Amino acid sequence: MAPWSGFWAASRPALAAAAAGGTPVVVKMDNPNWSISEIDADGGEFLAGGRRRGRGKNAKQITWVLLLKAHRAAGCLAWLASAAVALGAAARRRVAAGRTDDADAETPAPRSRLYAFIRASLLLSVFLLAVELAAHANGRGRVLAASVDSFHSSWVRFRAAYVAPPLQLLADACVVLFLVQSADRLVQCLGCLYIHLNRIKPKPISSPAAAAAALPDLEDPDAGDYYPMVLVQIPMCNEKEVYQQSIAAVCNLDWPRSNILVQVLDDSDDPITQSLIKEEVEKWRQNGARIVYRHRVLREGYKAGNLKSAMSCSYVKDYEYVAIFDADFQPYPDFLKRTVPHFKDNEELGLVQARWSFVNKDENLLTRLQNINLCFHFEVEQQVNGIFINFFGFNGTAGVWRIKALEDSGGWMERTTVEDMDIAVRAHLNGWKFVFLNDVECQCELPESYEAYRKQQHRWHSGPMQLFRLCLPDIIRCKIAFWKKANLIFLFFLLRKLILPFYSFTLFCIILPMTMFIPEAELPDWVVCYIPALMSFLNILPAPKSFPFIIPYLLFENTMSVTKFNAMISGLFQLGSAYEWVVTKKSGRSSEGDLIALAPKELKQQKILDLTAIKEQSMLKQSSPRNEAKKKYNRIYKKELALSLLLLTAAARSLLSKQGIHFYFLMFQGLSFLLVGLDLIGEDVK
């Protein structure tokens, strides 16, 4: 018994620590002279082999292996249990707090209409499920009242004659739209594949290698012909978490100081934030940067008004190009060197757009799912449109405009909340070409809370519908090629901005659960499962490290369809919430190494130390009492909760009719809506 007692004495403290919630341990046995395959072999053969080898293989050694496996299984179960407990505790906090999305900035009228429709659908589905359960129980021999039996028979005849045909017609129409949109996405993916296989890449007319060989030193006064005058704008509004990082990054752009001017366009209404930004600008000005601070007294037009006001300065006429960076963007020092050369000897080029990269893409599940979406947007949509038709929607930041293109297109307009798409469409109608550089990245942040992401998506999907209403007459009258008009109207606006959110919400959140209660109208399995799975697979290809999240991504995209549908309707019919502009909340995430890397080699050590201090100051500000006064809360989202109950009710009905694929889809989609409705995805504010 000595070996067993020795083993137990050695492993008992570690096992006790693991049982108490400590770090899982692995028990190591010295000189194991057997394998798992030997243990799984026939018992007699195993013992015989043991005798032949003269080894003491016995039941105690097998017990050790089973103990290790049991310990590993217990650790897994303990992790699942702790996760479930934490999830339940978070849900209880949300319900106890009682904070709903009624406090959001959206206008109540359109939101309440959609919520009333979803709630009515939920009540109807619960009633129909009760009727079906009563009929099901009656079929098993239970006694039902004659009135209930008569009602069920009348309902079956009524739904077959009057409800199922229009529902099936609507379902078929949505399926057609779904297939058209899927075909469009497949064509874009094939275009991206063609670009990668043939290594197609936008190149300046003067090759970068030749230009680099010919470029003199940056401090050479004769270098002006190679380094045109560039204006850099940083619009911001109450974004004290990130202003230091963006100003530091822009002030360290590798460009002759005499040929660059930085405009910090501060629309903050908080005096403390204004003072902090002024101090930061003054610090960099004293260090030799050409930088100015601008603050508007009349803050009209949101970001578009801010940019329009800045372009009205008298000194702008001395500059040829303007680079725009939002407050959370941190361009690398060589950004201008890799973008501006594309304008040289290319007078038709109006915009050079870089792609985004994200400093917090692994922060939580919400940021991981956003990263999948945006990787597909840049890698496939922007790159394919830029290569093949020289047009895409300007992303509003991390881009360089030819100032002449902005002026010829009417400049910045305040008529919509998507001023970036507005100027891009007008520039395209005026014949300007765009270039997208997939290999030039600019770091930024993703929204970490569902509330911030939801408001951002509402603005991004309501604005295009506003713009479509305003631009449609101009597109029809414009003297451009017919195929360009067709691309703008049918692909850019209708298919990708209107049809996509419409069928996503209508087909998967309303029609599909209704077909469970009206079985005469059907949706085939390939619509519910196979095609969406294929589209999710294509979407996740540009971010291969995110493959473990393919199922959460599919469910989350359908969950977001309610927000996108509501935004699309608001923009299309000019409802109040379509005109709201809410600045996306920032966290100020950036590594110290990233900030130090922003500094050019010729900067003194003191400036590098200043950059290092930015991170420390940012952390101190985030923990200061002044910031603690402004509290953040997790909310309960009523539309998402109502949809979760609707889908789970439909899942229960599909279980009665033994529709396997429909049941699993409805159940998991309902749980997804439940998690989002309780704000259990993204940042957890305690």
UniProtKB/Swiss-Prot annotation:
Please indicate if the UniProt record lists Ribosomal protein as a keyword.
no
Source domain of life is Eukaryota
Where does the chain bind substrate?
326, 328
Membrane topology is: Multi-pass membrane protein
GO cellular component terms, alphabetically, are:
Golgi apparatus; Golgi membrane
Q: Where is the active site?
A: 267, 420
**Enzyme Commission (EC) number:** 2.4.1.-
Please name the GO terms that the record assigns under molecular function: glycosyltransferase activity
Q: Which UniProt keywords apply?
A: Cell wall biogenesis/degradation, Glycosyltransferase, Golgi apparatus, Membrane, Transferase, Transmembrane, Transmembrane helix
| Gene3D superfamilies reported for this sequence | Spore Coat Polysaccharide Biosynthesis Protein SpsA, Chain A (3.90.550.10)
| Biological process, per Gene Ontology | cell wall organization
> Cellular location of this protein?
Golgi apparatus membrane
SUPFAM superfamilies attached here? Nucleotide-diphospho-sugar transferases
Presence of keyword Nuclease: no
- Give the transmembrane ranges: 114-134, 160-180, 498-518, 523-543, 640-656, 661-681
Q: What class of enzyme is it?
A: transferase
The main place the protein resides is: Golgi
The UniProt function text for this chain reads: Probable beta-1,4-glucan synthase rather involved in the synthesis of the xyloglucan backbone than cellulose. Seems to work simultaneously with xyloglucan 6-xylosyltransferase. Xyloglucan is a noncellulosic polysaccharides of plant cell wall and consists of a glucan backbone substituted by xylose, galactose and fucose.
What family, per the record? Belongs to the glycosyltransferase 2 family. Plant cellulose synthase-like C subfamily.
**What protein is this chain from?**
Putative xyloglucan glycosyltransferase 10
Tell me the organism. Answer: Oryza sativa subsp. japonica
